[in-house]
Every structure is written in structure tokens, then in C-alpha cells.
């Protein structure tokens, strides 16, 4: 048993806090490094192994960077508003504010027990009025610039959470929080106009040091398509509608058009005979998720409206249908159907016996089955016959433009960000409604609009704040007459879309941040968190940064220069941890038994950081044995240094061998840690401790050299085992603190050995290994190999045909 324990942890945590070791000085004249882990929801009662896997290893990386000379800023806070905290409160019967504050206190205690060098003086908590005052300020600034607006729209509704969900919060047709099937509802909601930044959000992705998969996910989510917009007029009316298509070359093959069930045009054009059928169909469509509606394998459904459109080129009548495979949220909510050249249109046309007109043939004239979806040559297209797909796209758009019936168009899959929620635990939207003045933003001087405590927050589908007359009834800031407050609250993703900007200036009461300071401190240099945020938080933060830049508050384009996703720690059974499965890991229990450093080192050694894996009790036990072994070997070295006996001052063979391992380890650990490859870095340190152990068994040792080696080893180990290393550093008689020491630098000359080991093969089989001078030439190596006693014995009575020398590695002697 070693001496390392939680008592050592506590000793050094107190010392670090008392001495202000990690206090950040923004005026320090060295390169800053803003290291940020995604802050956690305080919705449960404590930190789990997943939190630790995010925070512990990244803290080690930040410590490593500090020792390399960077001015590291590593703040911590809590994403305290939103559904998780509110649902926890509903489940336990405790008010969200009370449970959240209690949970934060517990999680702060756990995070401090980790021994991370978080800058707690810069903490932010999103549910505090001091923070959400500025979230409301952000809303007002977006509203002022036309980037926040209110409209009635079909929205995603979770019947279980009793609230609206953004598109990004719907996964496979279900609520990402509770997995309940999502339905559609028409509600008046607040949106942020993220689509105004769609091009830049897409184009700037390739300049980021982000995981390729995350970049691809955002590109797909933004979904830029270059095509054409075509206008169709409705027969016998003044009505018309646009369709977006990437295949305008197939326009002459249109045999019907389809509107989304939610398209408002449907109610205007439906005939009396078809009205009941269309209404019934619209009701059924509300029960289907967007994922289900767009499934290729699902049988197509639809209903005829009784109305017809006029084809813009041919003048022919084409029937207007309603089909749920068309989404109101994509393009214009209407599609031109070309069944000969589109699989979904083909399936729909076959089912409802609609015309199928071929207008594209293969370039080589070969027979092709329908639907033929490739590019080719136009046929049955009048003046456009014989043109290639690309030529026809240009000519047809030119013709449509001359008629005022079409134009080139870029379309995006990205929709505006829906930010209002019918829940209690969120930042109130700073708007009032006045009969005289309409929508009136709350003046900045009246912020924050505080969330009242005494509110019935159990979900019933309405905004809980609407039940509080004291909150709702107010006076109009513009005319002074009675007015009503907005009772929806902001999506918690609004709170987290700008928190990284608040950390460096968290005590500012006059503004959300000082632009001069923030432009010096940001962007964040290293951001670490889960990949599940790819199309939500990470996209929203990019949008808010760009919007604030355009308002003149920021001088940078992107919030997070480099992004890493940590892997997932699974239960011992290899399954995702959950209380219901009974496979959760409590860090507190393991820390109590082994200490925070052993727990941290196991997470860093037992798993590749970006992959994660299944928890193993055997794994943490082996890391504990490793730490105990380090302690024993350093104790032995320290005792020898203290006694000063059998000392020598020369660098002989044993010293050179240890020096080689020392510098080899410095190089490897530096390279691996820089790339967050912590498991291989620790493996190198395990190898080095073997070499150190071997040296301490020498009869005579160079004790000054030994102290230097042990000091270097502790500096390498310090980011991975901060409390243990600080203690050992102190016991070695060094000055406080090891984290004020410089990171060791490797000496390339030390990696060139005086002697190297050469394997000797006879006819491909290894017979012996010998040590030779590293600068020995080929002839010298050959002579040394042939003179070796074991090789003489192995080749006796045989003729040496050939000797092959691979310098520095092996000699192969061919005999017969």
C-alpha cells in the first residue's frame, strides 16, 4: 500500500486554492490559451463518469499546456435552465430553483475534488439573474436587427414534455429528451433568423480544426442546394405558387404537382367535392413525423385537391395533389412531380394512376428503365430537345426568367431557430404585448425580466408563467397603458449559445462583456464536449458569434477554433450507463478508495480519449498498482539521493541508457499529450519507470543525474496525477509548485545511443542478440556477428553464402 490517498488530494487542493496558483491574469505577457469543456446540466444529483471523462483528461491537457508556458484560462459553470432541470424538479417535487442550486453546490464540490485547475472566480450559472439579464439583452439585440421575429407556424410538439421542440431536438421522429413521438401543432412562436447566415455557416466550416464527421453533419444540416425556382399559376384564379427544383431540365415531364398538407394554399384551392377528403388527410398527416413522411420505403399517400395548375412552359393543366412526403419546412412546401425521373414521384404516380412522361434519355441512347434519375439528353421537351441536362438547365431558366416565371435559386435545408418554450424554467422573453403599441421590447434599463418563484410549473401544454397574474400584468414601456408580458421562456440553447463570451468578464454589471477584453481572449482555442451537439449548440454558438460580430461587438468569425469530442464511458456490461440498468459508475466511491489521481489516470489510460469504452474494475486496480510502484521507486531514489552514498559524477553506460529512456519518454509523452492521446502517453511513462527501477539497483549511481531524472519524470507525470506529483515533488525538496515548473524538453543527442542491440539470424532464425557501437560500419557489424560464439556454433560445418546487414537492427547470415 502506498501513501497516496484523498488526504494528499485535500492537502494540495487547499494549498492551490490558498496560494491562488491557478488565478488567471489576462495581462500576463505570454500567449493565452482558452481551454473550455462544455458545461454540464445540474439536472441530476451528481457528476457521473461521463462528466469526469470530459473534464479530467482535458484538465490534464490544460496543465500540460500551462507547463509549456501558455497563459491558460479554463473556466467552469453550469447550464442550469431548461427541460432537464425542470423535469428533475417535477419528478422530485422540489422547486427547480431549489433543486438546481443544491445540485450545483454538490457538483462544485465534486469538481473541486477532481483537483482541476478551473478558474472558479469566473464561474457562470445560466439561471442566475446576473447571467440571464444578458441573455435577454442578446434577444433584444437580435430583435433590433431583425434577427428575432414572431410568427405562426407548424411546430414540433412533445406531448410528454408539453412543449415545442426545435427541429434539431427531434431525433428519428421522437423527442431527444424523453423519446416520446413528436406531433405537429400550429402555434405562434419566436424564431431567430439563423438562415440569414446559412452561406457563411457552411462556407467557414472547412477552416475549422473540427472532427470531420461533425463538419459533415453541419454541412448536411445546413443543406445548401443550387437549383431553380419555378412559378405555377392556379387555373381559374389569381393564385400562384413557387416550387424549388434542382432538376429544372425535367420541367416538361411534370404531370402533377404536390403541396405539403400544411401549405396554406391548400385551403384556398380545394374544391367543395374534395374538401372533406383533404381535411381528413391533413389531420392524418399531423400524426406522422417528418422522418416517417420522407421514408423511401413507406407507401406513398395523397389526395387530389380538385384544382389544377398551369404548366409554365406548355400551358397544359396539371392536377394539384396534397401529399405528406412533401414538407412545408423544406423549399416552398410544394414540388413539381416528374415521375419518369424521380423515385418518389414515380411511386406516387403508379399508385394514383397519374401520367408518366419521359423527357430524359441516356447520353449513349441506350434503353433505360423508369424512373431514370441520371443526367442525360432531353426528349419530348419541344425546343429543348437534344440538349444535355446542364445545357437545358441554363436554357430553361433563361426562358422562364424572360416570362417572369422562374429564376436560379439557392435553397437550404436549414430552418430558422425556434426559441420559445411553453415551460417555466427558462429565461423570460423580454417582450410585452400592448393593445395600442403591439409588440414592445422591454427596455435594457428594465432588465432582467425576473423569473417569478411562486409559479405552478407542472406541464399542462400552456406556458406556466401565464398562470401568474403578478408576472403577466404590466405596463407598456412605450405608452404606459396596461400590457401583458410574453409568457413563453427561451430555449436553454440560447443561454449556452454565448456563455463562452461571459466567462472572461463574468462580473461585468454594465454589459454582457467588455469587447476589448473578449476580442483579446477569444476565440476559444480548445473546446471539448460530446458529438450530440453538432447540429444544435455548436451551430447556434457559431450563429450568435457571427451576429454579434456584425453588430460590432466581436472581431472574430468563429467561437471555437479547435474542437474535440470525447468518447463514451460505458458500464462494465458494455452498455450505456443508466440507473435502470444498474450499471452506473459513481466516481465518488472510487475516489474515496483510490484517490482522484488514480481515477483520472484510469480514465486516461484505459480508453482512447475520442473513443471511450467499457468500465473495468480490474483496469483501475492496475492503475492503482502502477501509482504505488512509482511511489516505491521514487522513495528508493529519494533515499539514495538523501544518503549520498556510492555516488559518482561520470555518465557511464547505465546513466546513458537511463538518459536515453528519459529523453525518449519526454519526446513521446509530449507528442502524445499534445494530440490528446493520453493512453499512449501513460504507456510510455510505464516503460520509463521500468528503466528508472533498473537504474536504482546499480551499486554506484550518479545522484545529481538521478535527481534530475526523477524531477523530469514527476514533471511529465504532473498533469496526469497532479496531487500525487505535487506531493512527490515536495518530498524531493523542490520549491512549490511543480505546476510553476517548465515542461521538460528532450535532447535529440540523448536519443543517439553509443551502443545499439543487433539481432543475428541464421537462415532467418534469430540465434543471438549483441551490442555493437552505434557508429560501427557494415563491415564492422558483419565481423562482430560472425565472431560471436553462438553464431560460430550455429554455422559450424556450413558454408556462409551471404551476410545481409540492416544497420541498427539485424544481421541475417545465409548458410548451406
Swiss-Prot record:
Belongs to the class-I aminoacyl-tRNA synthetase family. NCBIfam families: leuS_bact. It holds the Pfam family Anticodon_1. This is Leucine--tRNA ligase. Its main location: cytoplasm. A motif ('KMSKS' region) lies at residues 576-580. It is found in: Cytoplasm. HAMAP family: Leu_tRNA_synth_B. InterPro entries: aa-tRNA-synth_Ia (IPR002300), Leu-tRNA-ligase (IPR002302), Leu_tRNA-synth_edit (IPR025709), M/V/L/I-tRNA-synth_anticd-bd (IPR013155), Methionyl/Leucyl_tRNA_Synth (IPR015413), Rossmann-like_a/b/a_fold (IPR014729), tRNAsynth_Ia_anticodon-bd (IPR009080), Val/Leu/Ile-tRNA-synth_edit (IPR009008). GO terms for cellular component: cytosol. One of its GO terms (molecular function) is ATP binding. One of its GO terms (biological process) is leucyl-tRNA aminoacylation. ATP binds at residue 579. The keyword Acetylation does not apply. Its EC number is 6.1.1.4. Keywords: Aminoacyl-tRNA synthetase, ATP-binding, Cytoplasm, Ligase, Nucleotide-binding, Protein biosynthesis. The keyword Nucleotide-binding applies.
Amino acid at each position: 500500500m502506498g501513501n497516496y490517498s484523498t488526504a494528499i488530494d485535500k492537502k494540495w487542493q487547499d494549498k492551490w486554492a490558498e496560494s491562488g496558483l491557478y488565478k488567471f491574469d489576462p495581462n500576463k505577457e505570454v500567449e493565452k490559451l482558452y481551454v473550455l469543456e462544455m458545461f454540464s446540466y445540474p439536472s441530476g444529483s451528481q457528476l457521473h463518469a461521463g462528466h469526469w471523462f470530459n473534464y479530467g483528461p482535458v484538465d490534464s491537457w490544460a496543465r500540460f499546456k500551462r507547463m509549456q508556458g501558455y497563459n491558460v484560462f479554463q473556466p467552469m459553470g453550469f447550464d442550469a435552465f431548461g427541460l432537464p432541470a425542470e423535469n428533475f424538479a417535477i419528478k422530485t417535487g422540489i422547486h427547480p430553483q431549489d433543486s438546481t442550486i443544491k445540485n450545483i453546490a454538490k457538483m462544485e464540490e465534486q469538481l473541486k475534488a477532481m483537483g482541476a485547475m478551473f478558474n472558479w472566480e469566473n464561474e457562470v450559472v445560466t439561471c442566475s439573474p446576473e447571467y440571464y439579464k444578458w441573455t435577454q439583452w442578446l434577444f433584444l439585440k437580435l430583435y433590433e436587427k431583425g434577427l428575432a421575429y414572431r410568427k405562426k407556424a407548424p411546430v414540433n410538439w412533445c406531448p410528454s414534455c408539453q412543449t415545442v421542440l426545435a427541429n434539431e431536438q427531434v431525433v428519428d421522429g421522437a423527442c431527444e429528451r424523453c423519446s416520446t413521438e413528436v406531433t405537429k401543432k400550429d402555434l405562434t412562436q419566436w424564431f431567430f433568423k439563423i438562415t440569414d447566415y446559412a452561406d457563411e455557416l457552411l462556407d467557414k466550416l472547412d477552416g475549422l480544426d473540427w472532427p470531420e464527421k461533425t463538419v459533415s453533419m453541419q454541412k448536411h444540416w445546413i443543406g445548401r442546394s443550387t437549383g431553380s425556382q419555378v412559378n405555377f399559376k392556379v387555373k381559374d384564379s389569381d393564385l400562384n405558387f413557387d416550387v424549388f427544383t434542382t432538376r429544372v431540365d425535367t420541367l416538361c415531364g411534370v404531370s402533377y404537382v404536390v403541396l405539403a398538407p400544411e401549405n396554406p394554399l391548400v385551403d384556398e384551392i380545394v374544391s367543395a367535392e374534395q374538401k372533406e377528403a383533404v381535411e381528413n388527410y391533413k389531420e392524418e398527416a399531423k400524426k406522422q413525423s417528418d422522418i416517417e413522411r420522407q421514408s423511401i420505403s413507406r407507401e406513398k399517400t395523397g389526395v387530389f385537391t380538385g384544382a389544377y395548375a398551369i404548366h409554365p412552359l406548355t400551358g397544359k393543366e396539371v392536377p394539384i395533389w396534397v401529399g405528406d412526403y412533401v414538407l412545408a419546412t423544406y423549399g416552398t412546401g410544394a414540388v413539381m412531380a416528374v415521375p419518369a425521373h424521380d423515385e418518389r414521384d414515380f411511386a406516387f404516380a403508379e399508385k394514383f394512376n397519374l401520367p408518366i412522361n419521359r423527357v430524359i434519355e441516356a447520353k449513349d441512347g441506350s434503353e433505360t428503365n423508369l424512373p431514370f434519375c441520371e443526367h442525360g439528353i432531353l426528349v419530348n421537351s419541344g425546343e429543348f430537345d437534344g440538349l444535355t441536362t446542364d445545357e437545358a438547365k441554363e436554357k430553361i431558366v433563361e426562358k422562364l426568367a424572360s416570362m417572369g416565371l422562374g429564376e436560379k435559386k439557392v435553397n437550404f435545408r436549414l430552418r430558422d431557430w425556434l426559441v420559445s418554450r411553453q415551460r417555466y424554467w427558462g429565461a423570460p422573453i423580454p417582450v410585452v404585448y400592448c393593445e395600442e403599441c403591439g409588440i414592445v421590447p422591454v427596455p435594457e434599463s428594465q432588465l432582467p425580466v425576473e423569473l417569478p418563484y411562486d409559479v405552478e410549473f407542472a406541464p399542462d401544454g400552456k406556458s406556466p408563467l401565464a398562470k401568474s397574474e403578478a408576472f403577466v400584468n404590466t405596463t407598456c414601456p412605450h405608452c404606459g397603458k396596461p400590457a401583458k408580458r410574453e409568457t413563453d421562456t427561451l430555449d436553454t440553447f440560447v443561454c449556452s449559445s454565448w456563455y463562452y463570451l461571459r466567462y472572461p468578464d463574468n462580473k461585468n454589471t454594465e454589459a454582457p462583456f467588455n469587447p476589448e477584453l473578449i476580442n483579446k481572449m477569444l476565440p476559444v482555442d480548445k473546446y471539448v464536449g460530446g458529438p450530440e451537439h453538432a447540429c444544435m449548440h455548436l451551430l447556434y454558438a457559431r450563429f450568435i458569434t457571427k451576429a454579434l460580430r456584425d453588430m460590432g461587438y466581436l472581431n472574430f468569425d468563429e467561437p471555437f477554433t479547435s474542437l474535440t469530442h470525447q468518447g463514451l464511458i460505458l458500464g462494465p456490461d458494455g452498455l450505456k450507463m443508466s440507473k435502470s440498468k444498474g450499471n452506473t459508475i459513481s466516481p465518488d466511491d472510487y475516489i474515496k478508495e483510490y484517490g482522484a489521481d488514480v481515477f483520472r489516470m484510469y480514465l486516461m489510460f484505459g480508453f482512447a480519449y475520442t473513443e471511450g469504452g467499457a468500465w473495468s474494475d480490474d483496469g483501475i486496480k492496475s492503475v492503482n498498482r502502477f501509482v504505488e510502484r512509482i511511489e516505491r521507486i521514487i522513495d528508493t531514489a529519494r533515499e539514495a539521493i538523501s544518503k549520498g552514498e556510492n555516488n559518482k559524477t561520470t555518465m557511464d553506460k547505465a546513466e546513458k541508457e537511463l538518459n536515453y529512456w528519459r529523453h525518449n519518454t519526454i519526446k513521446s509523452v509530449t507528442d502524445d499529450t499534445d494530440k490528446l492521446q493520453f493512453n499512449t502517453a501513460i504507456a510510455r511513462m510505464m516503460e520509463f519507470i521500468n528503466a528508472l527501477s533498473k537504474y536504482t539497483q546499480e551499486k554506484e549511481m550518479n545522484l545529481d543525474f538521478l535527481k534530475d531524472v526523477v524531477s523530469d519524470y514527476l514533471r511529465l507525470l504532473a498533469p496526469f496525477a497532479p496531487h500525487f506529483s505535487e506531493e512527490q515533488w515536495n518530498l524531493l525538496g523542490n520549491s512549490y509548485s511543480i505546476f510553476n515548473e517548465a515542461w521538460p524538453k528532450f535532447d535529440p543527442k540523448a536519443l543517439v545511443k553509443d551502443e545499439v542491440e543487433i539481432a543475428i539470424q541464421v537462415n532467418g532464425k534469430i540465434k543471438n542478440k549483441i551490442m555493437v557501437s552505434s557508429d560501427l560500419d557494415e563491415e564492422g557489424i558483419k565481423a562482430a556477428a560472425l565472431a560471436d560464439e553462438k553464431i560460430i556454433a550455429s554455422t559450424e560445418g556450413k558454408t556462409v553464402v551471404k551476410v545481409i546487414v540492416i544497420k541498427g537492427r539485424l544481421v541475417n547470415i545465409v548458410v548451406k
